[in-house]
């Protein structure tokens, strides 16, 4: 399947960042060569509904931002951890449609940043080749 690019998502914890780094490195391998459009930090901070201007970095601060800078890719968004996301999901409503909440605004920011990243990618790189799966030795499920 030809891919325009990959968006790597992580949480701020070091163990999650290590996995995100492996993901970026995988996409950048010559045999895969899928452009990385950027990184998203999920559960970046906690914001209580009654104090929307307060940010509590319960899982650490700036982890994905630092990794993105280290790897030379863009940080596309820092998605906060808020109770209303779970409540909206339970009710079948997308979090992005919650009005001017911190999470809805950041999800809209993410969408805009992904569009910008795709536009930049399409100007600077040729179309991506299809990524094919193989049955190489060691990869078999038998």
What does each model-found stretch correspond to?
Residues 24, 103, 125-128:
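Residue-level signal for alpha-helical context at structural boundaries
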Residues 89-104:
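C-terminal boundary of histidine-terminating zinc-finger modules
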Residues 33, 116-124:
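Charged, solvent-exposed alpha-helical segments that act as regulatory interaction surfaces
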Residues 102-118:
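Acyltransferase
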Residues 109, 113, 123-142:
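A short, charged, Gly/Pro-tolerant segment at domain boundaries
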Residues 83, 97, 129-130:
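A generic alpha-helix propensity feature with a strong bias for hydrophobic helices
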Residues 1-87:
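Conserved catalytic-core segment of NTP-binding enzymes
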């Amino acid at each position: 399947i030809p891919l325009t690019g990959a968006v790597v998502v992580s949480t701020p914890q070091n163990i999650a960042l290590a996995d995100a780094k492996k993901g970026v490195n995988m996409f950048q391998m010559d045999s895969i060569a899928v452009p990385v459009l950027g990184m998203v930090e999920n559960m970046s901070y906690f914001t209580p509904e009654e104090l929307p201007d307060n940010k509590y970095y319960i899982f650490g601060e700036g982890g994905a931002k630092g990794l993105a800078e280290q790897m030379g890719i863009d940080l596309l968004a820092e998605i906060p951890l808020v109770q209303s996301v779970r409540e909206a999901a339970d009710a079948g409503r997308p979090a992005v449609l919650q009005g001017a909440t911190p999470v809805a605004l950041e999800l809209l920011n993410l969408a805009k940043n992904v569009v910008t990243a795709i536009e930049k990618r399409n100007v600077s790189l040729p179309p991506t080749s299809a990524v094919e799966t193989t049955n190489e030795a060691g990869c078999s499920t038998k």
